[in-house]
């Protein structure tokens, strides 16, 4: 009686599967260059942003940039994380309240045509929760009125005509009436 051929073949296949998994886990990390590097950094760092060279406080190797590290050498997740900017505050972090300026804080215009009052009214309207439909309807009405005024100015006659016809009322020019006497 011999050993069935199926059992050693099954053992060999299982061994090859495990070996390939272990090799994939311990093989050197891949290299990233150009757009792939930027896309990967954006994915890893998210809202925090990233640097192409580490800030001075984080330098633990010779000052190489991320391009030299990831494009010419192997690049892994831990290395990518070192190039992320300072972490953004989490939503649960309430240690420092947001800065709120008092209403009497002096405000200075930013530009030549800056109208703080108009902006403030719009912001107050938004805070009150005025529906966008009403704001849009009011804006459309104002736009139609403005267009009507512009149209009226555009079609104004160049010379003004008298509203009454002088010949119809028997009134001729003063010179003509003076000759009748």
Swiss-Prot record:
Glycans are attached at residue 163. Residues 1-24 form the signal peptide. Residues 65-85 are annotated as: A. InterPro entries: IGF2 (IPR022334), IGF2_C (IPR013576), Insulin-like (IPR016179), Insulin-like_growth_factor (IPR022350), Insulin-like_sf (IPR036438), Insulin_CS (IPR022353), Insulin_family (IPR022352). Residues 92-181 form a propeptide. Disulfide bonds join 33-71, 45-84, 70-75. It is found in: Secreted. It comes from the Eukaryota. GO terms for biological process: embryonic placenta development; embryonic placenta morphogenesis; glucose metabolic process; in utero embryonic development; negative regulation of muscle cell differentiation; negative regulation of transcription by RNA polymerase II; ossification; positive regulation of activated T cell proliferation. GO terms for cellular component: extracellular space. Residues 53-64 are annotated as: C. Belongs to the insulin family. This is Insulin-like growth factor 2. It comes from Sus scrofa (Pig). The gene is IGF2.
């Amino acid at each position: 009686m011999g050993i069935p051929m199926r059992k050693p073949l099954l053992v060999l296949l299982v061994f090859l599967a495990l070996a390939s998994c272990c090799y994939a886990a311990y093989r050197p990390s891949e290299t990233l260059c150009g757009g792939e590097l930027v896309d990967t950094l954006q994915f890893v760092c998210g809202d925090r942003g990233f640097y192409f060279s580490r800030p001075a406080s984080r330098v633990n190797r010779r000052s190489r940039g991320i391009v030299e590290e990831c494009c010419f050498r192997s690049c892994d997740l831990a290395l990518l994380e070192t190039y992320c900017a300072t972490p953004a505050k989490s939503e649960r972090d309430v240690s420092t309240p947001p800065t709120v300026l008092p209403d009497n804080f002096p405000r200075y215009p930013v530009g030549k045509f800056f109208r703080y009052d108009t902006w403030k009214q719009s912001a107050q309207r938004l805070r009150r929760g005025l529906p966008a439909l009403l704001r849009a309807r009011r804006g459309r009405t104002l736009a139609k009125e403005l267009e009507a005024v512009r149209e009226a100015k555009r079609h104004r006659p160049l010379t003004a005509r008298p509203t009454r016809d002088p010949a119809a009322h028997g009134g001729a020019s003063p010179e003509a009436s003076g000759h009748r006497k």
